[in-house]
A protein has these predicted regions:
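Glycine/tyrosine- and acidic-biased, solvent-exposed loop/turn segments at the edges of beta-strands
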Residues: 1-136
Length: 136
């Protein structure tokens, strides 16, 4: 039996669930419906700070997701469509300045991606095209 989708007593998980680290701090919280992750989910670091948050639809990452560093600063934002990166993604330097940004389609970088130094100055642009034969 898969403990990720089944409750301790056997049936598929249904409802709000939380899991804890060995030390008792919250590791994650979210909802299952018929054994599949659904709705908003939050994942935490051992220091208690939020690590990531986003949504699941029918067990797959969907919609906007956000990740954070151990100190709580924003690390990355992006979108998923059925567990695949799709839409604008941004990563941030530890000082909070934008590191890079661009777009994904079906898990592939497409179009212009821009990279910035820690002071915010544009240092590189690169064009990406979908690989032949891909779903992009």
């Amino acid at each position: 039996m898969d403990s990720d989708t089944h409750a301790a007593d056997g049936p598929l998980k249904d409802g709000i669930f939380k899991e804890y680290f060995v030390d008792g701090t919250l590791s994650w919280e979210g909802e299952f419906r018929a054994g599949e992750k659904t709705g908003e989910w939050k994942y935490y670091l051992k220091n208690g700070r939020l690590k990531a948050s986003g949504h699941f639809v029918a067990g797959k990452m969907s919609g906007p997701w956000t990740w954070y560093r151990e100190n709580g600063q924003l690390m990355q934002t992006g979108q998923f469509v059925e567990e695949r990166k799709d839409g604008v993604w941004r990563r941030y330097h530890p000082n909070g300045a934008l590191h890079d940004e661009g777009e994904y389609h079906a898990d592939q970088k497409v179009g212009e991606w821009r990279t910035y130094d820690a002071s915010g100055a544009l240092i590189k642009t690169r064009q990406h095209r979908a690989r032949p034969g891909s779903a992009a």
